[in-house]
A protein has these predicted regions:
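Conserved AMP-binding loop of ANL adenylate-forming enzymes
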Residues: 106-143
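Conserved ATP-dependent adenylate/AMP-binding module captured primarily in the ANL superfamily
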Residues: 44, 101-119, 153-165
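Residue-level signal for inorganic ion chemistry
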Residues: 16, 81, 120, 168
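Short, flexible loop segments at the rims of nucleotide/cofactor-binding pockets, characterized by
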Residues: 97-98, 124, 144-148
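Nucleotide 5′-phosphate-binding alpha/beta core
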Residues: 1-80, 86-103, 110-111
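Conserved adenylate-forming
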Residues: 11, 30, 132-197
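Conserved small/polar residues in nucleotide/adenosyl-binding loops
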Residues: 81, 197-199
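Short glycine-enriched loops at secondary-structure junctions
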Residues: 75, 98, 125-127, 173
Length: 199
């Protein structure tokens, strides 16, 4: 496993150096080259970026900034962080990135118990935050995806009763809140809703 990790690390560091303005400059300033990685421990010699650096470089130069490693025309999707700690940071995705993301999500859903005969409600928002397209991972697995998103609780309860999903993805606090609203509205979870797996 470590041999594979080392091989992938070497490839990634070389790719970053050869294809991004930021990492080439950062490595050169630190006096390191991709060829300096001979073991996994050698990663400690290389400079790391943080959120502050991401924000400072994301709009310098090209549209996606100095850290983007592909031309803008290869980007087919972009998302941003939530912005809870400052200016949102941008994540550009190529078609290959997007496909790998969906494959990864399908595997994660499978590990969480989702199967092709499941009905899945995505109860998180579909704004610029990267969570939205996870739904496609459920579809890739073969499950029925019900694209609800961030709707009022009354509407989500209607969807849960009407379409009887077997899986819902939302935050733990909102799942609790939804249960409280369901009680207030006179729903009986045992009778009105199927047994839900909460992801």
């Amino acid at each position: 496993l470590e041999a594979l990790q080392l091989e992938r690390l070497k490839d990634m560091v070389a790719y970053a150096y050869d294809n991004t303005v930021y990492y080439k400059r950062a490595f050169d300033e630190a006096g390191v080259k991709p060829g300096d990685i001979e073991s996994l421990d050698d990663i400690a010699k290389f400079p790391f970026c943080d959120k502050k650096t991401e924000r400072e470089t994301q709009h310098v130069g090209s549209f996606f900034g100095e850290m983007c490693s592909v031309p803008e025309e290869e980007v087919i999707f972009m998302a941003t962080s939530s912005g809870s700690t400052g200016v949102p940071t941008v994540s550009p995705f190529t078609q290959e990135d997007f496909d790998l993301w969906q494959d990864t999500e399908a595997r994660l859903f499978w590990q969480a118990g989702m199967r092709p005969n499941d009905r899945y409600v995505h109860g998180l928002n579909f704004a610029l935050y990267v969570g939205g397209p996870d739904v496609i991972g459920a579809q890739r697995l073969g499950a029925l995806a019900i694209w609800v998103g961030a709707v009022p609780s009354d509407r989500l309860l209607f969807v849960l009763k009407q379409y009887q999903p077997t899986i819902i993805w939302t935050s733990p606090s909102y799942a609790w809140h939804l249960g409280e609203i369901a009680k207030e509205k006179g729903f009986d979870p045992k009778e009105d809703f199927l047994s839900l797996i909460h992801i």
